[in-house]
Amino acid sequence: MKKVQAYVFLDTVNPGPMRIVVEVRKVPGVVRADALFGAPDIMVLVEGDDLSQLDDVINRIVELDGVVDSESKVIRRV
């Protein structure tokens, strides 16, 4: 069974994106996390076995110190 994936876009306090990327990468379920130039500050690819697990991963990320806003987009398989 394929995992459910989503992109999570984070806005952070400045300075801080590089420090926060390091912390985001430690969260189980994070596939990739990258700092960006411009807004949003960070883009994260996350995955879980189902939407509930995906929600848990996203909640752990957005609760990290320095994250001020987030937007999540579940990937639609075609």
Model-found features: residue ranges?
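A compositional/biophysical signature of low hydrophobicity enriched in polar/charged and small residues
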Residues: M1-V78
